[in-house]
Swiss-Prot record:
Annotated protein name in UniProt: SPbeta prophage-derived putative HNH endonuclease YoqL
Entry EC no(s): 3.1.-.-
Organism: Bacillus subtilis (strain 168)
Residues annotated as domain HNH: 136-188
InterPro entries with a match to the protein in the record: HNH, HNH_nuc
High-level lineage: Bacteria, Bacillati, Bacillota, Bacilli, Bacillales
SMART domains the UniProt entry points to: HNHc (SM00507)
Keyword presence, Hydrolase: yes
Keywords noted in UniProt: Endonuclease, Hydrolase, Nuclease
Taxonomic superkingdom: Bacteria
Length: 230
């Protein structure tokens, strides 16, 4: 294992982004999948990949226009020119708007990212996993069997902090443990739209356990509201 790029933190496998130098859990939540890489993950974290792509697009804008002018001399390119110019104008207009609305975009990204990550403590997360017997709440996979591929070898990785309701809270009340496979499969589907009898991993017992976990927080909130009103 390359200690400069990979290491174990708190018992779980982490990877260092070569761009921003941040140590992040080596999962597809933080890195894009790249099959040709030995660990199956991009060398840059997702945030840096998007940043580099934007910088490249802005840097090469003039070169794109020059190549377009050369192609305009070819037969049948007049109509293609109209479509391409329209596309570039839209992109340029979008870039101008982005430059004028940096603060608005920053706030939007913060709000978007806030709904991607859970704001829970390590203790809360461990209690959550303990409640589900350290198994994926959807398929029942044991955490010791939850592994990712690195240099041809499977090594243990932590479960994903799954948003049951993607538009719901970012705290422990909307969090359950999910393996990589179930997390990817569920994506943005509504909970019971995805987790039902048509799902090969469905279990009525696991469904009941998930609902019991979520309901305990609903009851706590209701009790708190009742005491406040009282």
């Amino acid at each position: 294992m390359d200690s400069k790029k990979h290491k174990i933190i708190n018992g779980y496998y982490h990877k260092n982004c070569i761009s921003c130098k941040s140590w992040l859990p080596a999962t597809e939540e933080n890195f894009y999948s790249v099959k040709k890489n030995k660990d199956g993950l991009h060398s840059y974290c997702k945030a840096c990949v998007l940043k580099k792509a934007k910088e490249s697009m802005l840097k090469n804008y003039d070169k794109q226009l020059e190549r377009m002018r050369e192609r305009n001399l070819l037969p049948g390119m007049k109509e293609a020119k109209k479509k391409y110019n329209s596309s570039l104008k839209k992109k340029k207009t979008q870039q101008i708007w982005q430059e004028k609305n940096k603060l608005k975009l920053k706030n939007y990204r913060l709000q978007r990212d806030a709904h991607k990550k859970h704001n829970i403590t390590d203790v809360q997360w461990q209690k959550c996993k303990d409640y589900f017997n350290n198994k994926c709440s959807y398929c029942g996979l044991k955490i010791e069997d939850h592994k990712i591929l690195f240099k041809g070898t499977y090594i243990q990785s932590d479960f994903h902090k799954e948003h049951v309701d993607h538009k719901g809270a970012n705290d422990i009340s909307n969090c359950i443990p999910a393996c990589k496979s179930c997390n990817s499969s569920k994506h943005d589907f509504a909970f019971e739209e995805w987790y039902n009898s048509s799902n090969k991993n469905f279990s009525s017992e696991r469904l009941l356990k998930i609902k019991e976990w979520l309901n305990r927080f609903k009851e706590e909130r209701q009790d708190s509201e009742w005491r406040t009103k009282g």
